[in-house]
Amino acid sequence: MSLRYYIKNILFGLYCTLIYIYLITKNSEGYYFLVSDKMLYAIVISTILCPYSKYAIEYIAFNFIKKDFFERRKNLNNAPVAKLNLFMLYNLLCLVLAIPFGLLGLFISIKNN
C-alpha cells in the first residue's frame, strides 16, 4: 500500500471523526450522545486503520472477482445514484470494521512488501 492510497482513503474516516467531535462539542441542548473516552479512542483507532481495512477488503474481494468482470458488465454505470449509495455503504462498512480488517490489511501489506 502506498502513501497516496493511505491519504486518499483516510479522508472518509477523518470526516466521520470530525463530525463526531463536532456533535460532542455542540451538545448544548441536552441531547444524550455517546460521549466517553473509550468511544473517542475507538473512533480514532478506526480512523487510522480505515485505509488498511479498505485495502484488506479489496485484496480479498479481488481474489474472487475476475479481471474482466467490469469490462463485461457495461450496464454497471447506468445507475449513478445506486452506485453512489453503494459506495457510501462500502465506506461506512470499512470504517465500522476498521479495527479487525485494518489489522488484517496491515498484515497483508507487510507480507506483500
Curated annotation (Swiss-Prot):
GO terms for molecular function: toxic substance binding. GO terms for biological process: bacteriocin immunity. Keywords: Bacteriocin immunity, Plasmid. InterPro entries: Microcin. This protein is able to protect a cell, which harbors the plasmid ColE1 encoding colicin E1, against colicin E1. This is Colicin-E1 immunity protein. The lineage of its organism: Bacteria, Pseudomonadati, Pseudomonadota, Gammaproteobacteria, Enterobacterales. The gene is imm.
